[in-house]
Swiss-Prot record:
Pfam families attached to this UniProt entry: Sec6
Example GO biological process: exocyst localization
GO molecular function, one term: SNARE binding
Source species of the chain: Homo sapiens (Human)
UniProt lineage: Eukaryota, Metazoa, Chordata, Craniata, Vertebrata
Full protein name: Exocyst complex component 3-like protein
Length: 746
C-alpha cells in the first residue's frame, strides 16, 4: 500500500482547543513580565537596562517557540503511526473472519459425514463387547455357583473365605464393566446383597465380641480382619465406600449396651440397690474381659478398653437419666443411687480399680449425675426421710404417752432415777440419719441435719402439748393418772437426757448457734413441766393455806406441820430426778410454798390484838421459816438456794416494838426484795394492828424514799408473784396509793 493510499486512509485531524499547558505557561509569563515591569517603573534607574531585557526576552521567546514546534511535530508523527497500525489491524481481522467462515463450512460437512458412520461405530462397540464376553464367558458361567458358595460361607461364619470369594466376584464385575461400557450383567445383580449380608454377619460378630472372645476368638479376629481389609481398600470410581470399621465399632458399642442396659424396664421400687450391686460386679468383669480377651483380637487403633469404658459409662448415664425422668424414687433408692454414683462407681471397687489401666479412666467424662440430678435426689431423700422420721418420733411419743396412765409408776435405772428409752430412741433416730447422710455428701448431711433439728423441735412441741393434755385430763377427771407427778418428773429426766445428748447432733464446723432453737425448745419444755408440777403442788396445799394465818396458826405449829408433811409426801420422789434439774425443781417447789404462804398472809385474815400476839406471830414466822428450810434441806435443796428466809424479814416487821422505826425496816425489806410493792407492805403492816394512820403513811413513804437496791440484793421474783389483797379488812387500812390518799383525807 503506497503512501498516497495510506494518507487517504488516515482520518483528518480537526483543530481542537488550545492546550491548557500552553495557556497556563502564557499566564505565568505575563505575570512574571508584569512583575518585572512594575519593579522597573518603581525604580527609574533600571530603565536604562530595558533594552537588554527586551532582547533577552525575544531570544527566550524564540527558543520556546522552536521547542513547541518540535514537540508538536513529534506528536503528529506518533498519531500518524497509530492510525496506520489501526488500519493494518482492520485488514487482519477481516482476513481472520473469512478463514473462520470457511472452517465453519468444513465442519458442517464433516458432521454430516459422521452421521453416516454412526451405525458403523455401534457395530464396532458391539463387536468389542462380544469379544470381551467371549473371553470372560467361562468365568461368567461360574458366577451363580460362586454366589451360592459365598452365601454358604457367610451362613457358616467363614468370613475370610466368603470375603475372598466376594472380592473375586467383584473383580470379575469390574473386568466386565469397562468392556460393556458400564453395563451390569444380570448375573451380578445379587452381589451387593451378598456384600451387605457379609457386613451384617461381621457386625453381628462384633456385637457379640465379649462372648466370642471367650468362646471363639478366631471368629472375632476373622470378622475384624474382614472389616479392616474392606475399609482399607481403594473404592472403585462410582461405588459408595463401605466403612465396615465404623460399623464394627458401632456394633461393639451397641452389643455392649444391649448386654447391660438393653432392657427398657427400669428397676422396680426397692430393687434399685440390687440392680446397682449387680452392675458393681458386672462392669469391672466386663472391663477385665475387654482388656484380657477382646483387645488382643482387635487392632490397636480400636482402643478396646477405652471404648468399653466410655460405652459402659454413656449407657449407664443414659439409663440413670431415664430412671430419674420416671416416677419419684423412694428414700432407700435415692440414697443408694447417690452413694453408688458418687462413691462406689469411681471408687476402687469399680472404675477406679488399680487393676484397670489408664484407658479405663472415665473421671474426665460427663458425670453420671448432673448437679440438677443430685439436687433432685437429695430433695427426694430428705423429704421421704423427714416423713419417716416424723412418723417414728410420733410413734415414740405415742408409746411414751400410753404409759402415763399405767397403774404402776415410771421405770427406773440402776441409780433409782426415772428412766425411759424414748430420749435415746429419738436421738438415735436423728443421729443415725445424719450419719447415713454423711456417707453421701456434705450437702446431703447438712440438709438432713437441718431436717433433724426441725423435727426435733416439732417433737419437743408435741411432747409439751401432750403434757398439757395429760394435765388437763387429770385435773378435769377425764383420765385420772395414778402416778401423775412421777410421770411429770420422768418427763424432766427425758428433757435432761435430751439436753445432755443433743450435742451429738452438732456437725463439725457448723456454727455454734445451730442448736440454739432446739435448746430454746428444751428450756421451754422444762419450764412447762415445772409449771405443771408446781400447779399440782399448789392444788395439794391450797386447802391447808386457807386457814393461815389464824388464831390456831398462832397457837399451834400443827397447821404448818401439815403443810410440811404434805409437801414432803409430794416431793418424796424428787430425788429420782437427775441433777442439776432436781435442784432447780426443789428451788421452784420451795418458792411455790413460800409464795402460797405470803399470799395467805396478804389476805388480811388476821390482825394482832396486842404486843403479845405480834410477838407470837413473829415467833411463828421464825419457826415456820426454820421448819420450811429444814424440810427442803432434808429433800436435798442446797442451802444457798432457799427463799424461806423471806419470812424472817417479815418477822422483823411484826416484832418491832417501836413503830417509829418501821420506816427503816420497810426500807431494808425493799433493799432485800426490790419487787415488793406498797400494797404488799400495807397488807403486812395491817397484821400488826397497832399503827395509826400517820404511822402507816410514814412507813409507806419510807418505801418510796428507800435507796435503790444494792447489786447484791436478791433478784429472785417473789412479791411480784403474790397478788395484793383486793379489799382490806375493816380493822386494817386501805392498801396502796389509795390507802395513802384516804389517810391524808382523814
Amino acid at each position: 500500500m503506497d503512501s498516497a493510499a495510506k494518507d487517504e486512509m488516515q482520518p483528518a485531524l480537526s483543530p481542537g482547543p488550545e492546550w491548557p499547558e500552553q495557556e497556563r505557561a502564557e499566564q505565568l509569563a505575563r505575570g512574571a513580565a508584569l512583575k518585572w515591569a512594575s519593579g522597573i517603573f518603581y525604580r527609574p534607574e533600571q530603565l536604562a537596562r530595558l533594552g537588554q531585557y527586551r532582547s533577552r526576552e525575544v531570544q527566550r521567546t524564540c527558543s520556546l517557540e522552536s521547542r513547541l514546534k518540535s514537540v508538536m511535530q513529534s506528536y503528529l508523527e506518533g498519531v500518524q503511526t497509530g492510525v496506520w497500525q489501526l488500519a493494518q489491524a482492520i485488514e487482519v481481522v477481516q482476513g481472520t473472519r473469512e478463514a473462520l467462515s470457511q472452517a465453519r463450512g468444513l465442519l458442517q460437512g464433516m458432521s454430516q459425514a459422521l452421521q453416516t458412520l454412526e451405525p458403523l461405530r455401534e457395530r464396532v462397540a458391539q463387536h468389542k463387547q462380544l469379544q470381551a464376553l467371549s473371553h470372560l464367558l467361562p468365568r461368567l458361567r461360574a458366577v451363580p455357583a460362586a454366589v451360592s458358595h459365598t452365601q454358604t460361607l457367610i451362613d457358616g461364619q467363614q468370613f475370610l473365605e466368603a470375603y475372598v470369594s466376594l472380592r473375586e466376584l467383584e473383580q470379575l464385575r469390574e473386568d466386565t464393566w469397562a468392556p460393556l461400557g458400564g453395563l451390569e450383567l444380570p448375573v451380578f445383580q445379587g452381589l451387593d446383597l451378598l456384600f451387605e449380608a457379609l457386613g451384617q454377619a461381621v457386625e453381628a460378630a462384633a456385637g457379640a465380641a465379649g462372648k466370642l472372645a471367650r468362646e471363639d476368638p478366631a471368629l472375632l479376629v476373622a470378622a475384624v480382619r474382614v472389616a479392616e481389609v474392606e475399609t482399607g481398600r481403594t473404592t472403585p470410581l462410582g461405588q459408595v465406600p463401605r466403612d465396615w470399621r465404623q460399623r464394627c465399632l458401632r456394633a461393639l458399642q451397641e452389643g455392649l449396651e444391649q448386654a447391660h442396659f438393653g432392657s427398657p424396664l427400669l428397676p422396680a421400687p426397692g430393687a434399685l440397690p440390687g440392680w446397682l450391686e449387680a452392675l458393681r460386679v458386672a462392669l469391672p468383669v466386663e472391663l477385665a474381659t475387654a482388656e484380657a480377651l477382646v483387645a488382643p483380637c482387635c487392632p490397636p487403633q480400636y482402643n478396646v478398653v477405652q471404648l468399653w469404658a466410655h460405652t459402659l459409662h454413656s449407657g449407664l448415664r443414659r439409663s440413670l437419666q431415664n430412671l430419674l425422668a420416671g416416677p419419684e424414687l423412694e428414700a432407700a433408692d435415692a440414697f443408694a443411687l447417690l452413694h453408688w454414683a458418687l462413691h462406689v462407681y469411681l471408687g476402687q471397687e469399680m472404675m477406679g480399680s488399680l487393676e484397670l489401666g489408664p484407658e479405663a479412666d472415665v473421671s474426665q467424662l460427663e458425670p453420671l449425675l448432673t448437679l440438677e440430678n443430685i439436687e433432685q435426689l437429695e430433695a427426694t431423700f430428705v423429704a421421704n426421710i423427714q416423713a419417716s422420721v416424723s412418723q417414728w418420733l410420733q410413734n415414740a411419743l405415742d408409746g411414751e404417752v400410753a404409759e402415763w396412765g399405767r397403774e404402776h409408776g415410771p421405770n427406773t435405772d440402776p441409780s433409782g432415777s426415772y428412766y425411759s428409752p424414748m430420749p435415746a430412741i429419738v436421738l438415735q433416730i436423728l443421729e443415725e440419719n445424719i450419719r447415713v447422710a454423711s456417707l453421701v455428701s456434705e450437702s446431703l448431711q447438712q440438709r438432713v441435719h437441718g431436717m433433724a433439728l426441725s423435727e426435733l423441735g416439732t417433737f419437743l412441741r408435741s411432747f409439751s402439748d401432750a403434757l398439757i393434755r395429760f394435765s388437763r385430763d387429770h385435773f378435769r377427771g377425764k383420765s385420772m393418772a395414778p402416778h401423775y407427778v412421777p410421770y411429770l418428773l420422768a418427763a424432766l429426766n427425758h428433757k435432761s437426757a435430751l439436753s445432755s445428748s443433743v450435742s451429738v447432733l452438732q456437725l463439725d464446723g457448723a456454727p455454734s448457734g445451730a442448736l440454739a432453737p432446739v435448746e430454746a425448745a428444751l428450756d421451754e419444755l422444762q419450764r412447762r413441766i415445772y409449771r405443771l408440777v408446781l400447779e399440782a403442788l399448789q392444788a395439794e396445799l391450797q386447802p391447808l393455806f386457807a386457814d393461815l394465818p389464824s388464831r390456831q396458826w398462832l397457837s399451834s405449829p400443827e397447821l404448818l406441820q401439815s403443810v410440811c408433811e404434805r409437801t414432803g409426801r409430794f416431793c418424796r420422789d424428787f430425788w429420782r430426778v437427775r441433777n442439776p434439774t432436781v435442784q432447780l425443781l426443789l428451788a421452784e417447789a420451795e418458792r411455790a410454798v413460800v409464795l402460797q404462804y405470803l399470799s395467805a398472809l396478804m389476805q388480811g385474815r388476821l390482825v394482832c390484838r396486842g404486843a403479845d400476839e405480834r410477838t407470837q406471830a413473829a415467833e411463828r414466822l421464825r419457826h415456820d421459816a426454820a421448819q420450811l428450810q429444814q424440810l427442803f434441806l432434808s429433800l436435798g435443796l442446797e442451802e444457798n438456794a432457799h427463799c424461806a428466809p423471806v419470812l424472817l424479814a417479815l418477822r422483823e416487821l411484826l416484832n418491832l416494838r417501836d413503830p417509829a422505826l418501821l420506816g427503816l425496816e420497810v426500807a431494808g425489806l425493799r433493799q432485800q426484795f426490790p419487787d415488793v410493792s406498797e400494797d404488799h407492805v400495807s397488807a403486812l403492816l395491817g397484821l400488826r394492828g397497832d399503827l395509826s394512820r400517820e404511822q402507816h403513811l410514814a412507813a409507806l413513804s419510807s418505801l418510796q424514799a428507800a435507796l435503790p437496791p444494792s447489786p447484791r440484793a436478791s433478784r429472785r421474783v417473789l412479791f411480784s408473784l403474790v397478788p395484793a389483797p383486793a379489799l382490806a379488812p375493816a380493822s386494817c387500812l386501805p392498801s396502796g396509793s389509795c390507802a395513802r390518799a384516804l389517810l391524808l383525807a382523814e
